[in-house]
Amino acid sequence: MHKHDPDGTRLPIKIDSTSNGEYEPIPISALNEQANHLALQQAEQNSRRLQQTRRKFLISSCGAASTLLAFNQANAYAGKRGGYFDLHPDAGLDRFAAAEQLEGNEFIFDVQGHYVNPEGDWLGQLPESARPYAQMEKASCEAASEPGSRAYLNCLSADEFIKDVFLDSDTDIMVLSFVPSTREREPVTIEDADATRQIVADLQGSKRLMIHGRVNPNQEGDLEAMDELAANWDISAFKTYTQYGPGGVGFFLHDEAGIAMIERAQRLGVRNICVHKGLPFGPQSYEHSQCSDIGIVAKRFPDMNFLVYHSGFVATVQEQAFAAGAGRDGIDTLIQSLIDNAVAPNANVYAELGSSWRFLMRDPDNAAHALGKLFRYVGEDNVLWGTDSIWYGSPQDQIQAFRSFQISQEFQDRFGYPVITPGMRRKVFGLNAARPYGISEEEIRLHTAVDSVAQRKTNYLNDPQPSFLTYGPRNRREFLNFLNWGG
């Protein structure tokens, strides 16, 4: 019995307008709409040929392959030549061909995950009549029918988080990160994050969840709070937002506040600084969302790691081949900063793909330029896997799309981009992040292969129930409501 979408109207690869709440949702293009329509048509045809219901077909590897092949067809018809999903033409019908290209045993370490505590203190700051997140797709899950005016928040529970991330996807480890906020307005606090980590750990002690410590050094009390975060919460990095601050004014990492944060982290023995760059919140303090400061601090602090979350990607910028000195926005601000400060590829700057890859899945030309430039200038050892889930629902569709995406031969020849090899995919999926986060893949595999999450997944896959739903806002009204709730 299918608990979710019994009629099979939801595609397993989710190309839609959902945002992570840090930027206003951007509608998908007419081409994306056509591709989604074609994918549903082909799902209907292929499910009939295989004598399956459309829902049963769509939750299979063939369903994902059929969807990606439909995207290829629509993109090719529109003249998109930069990249494609490298799948056998029969993968939409042949489960072995689909499995060969969309299933895998890579070590997958998602360095950017999010969780909202449905019972957190933040609810007490809202009017009793408020129904935060009620309009999100995910709020329509089965748990929403339980008693209580806010029962739908159970759809955001730790159990649902575990299902989306560890049962419905191939993710092995995730880092819980934080949204920009003050301590008083955090939708998930350090205590919430630790409690969620403990829920997973209690399943059998495996280290499947790690956490960041949120700090904005231009905010009163945040610098001093770093000591307590490092001492008491076993954090793996400090996470900061340079476009965020009092009165909407941000900071640069090489400003006094930024340097104070880096030096304090250094003294505390926390070598990872995770910084949101790109995906600007709006026009105010826009320059602080760009990456000009990254190369400066990377050169000044060679013993520190700077993990650039979103890689400086700007959704409204069409990525193209890098041109030194052209002053282009987006990922090029990161590349230019590295070049200006003689920071070599595969040094102490890392480019993370959360939200960026999800958006790049819309346009294979954009994806080819973005990935090609990151591999070339940041280094194939320093590109990190992140998905920004739960906002985009289960990250499995992002995993499947990345497993199969390839830069075209034309773009390789014209722009010097590399072919994406299986070895490079393994690096991006987890091996690259294992270094700054101090994780041994072998150790993690040893624990996660036999822990209770793995056992639950084995049982779950006998009757999988992926929802193919998202959590984040999908339009301006939902986005503004999200901001009002402290998102």
Which residues does each PLM region occupy?
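Active-site gating/metal-coordination segments in enzymes
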Residues: 89-92, 173, 178-289
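Mid-to-C-terminal alpha-helical segments outside catalytic/metal-binding sites
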Residues: 51-69, 94-99, 107, 123, ...
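N-terminal twin-arginine translocation
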Residues: 38-59, 67-95
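Active-site environment of divalent metal-dependent phosphoester hydrolases
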Residues: 116-119, 181-184, 218-221, 245-247, ...
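Catalytic pocket-lining loop regions of alpha/beta-barrel enzymes
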Residues: 236-237, 247-385, 410-419, 468-486
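Alpha-helical scaffold segments that flank or form the walls of functional sites
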Residues: 106, 124-203
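N-terminal secretory signal peptides
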Residues: 1-52
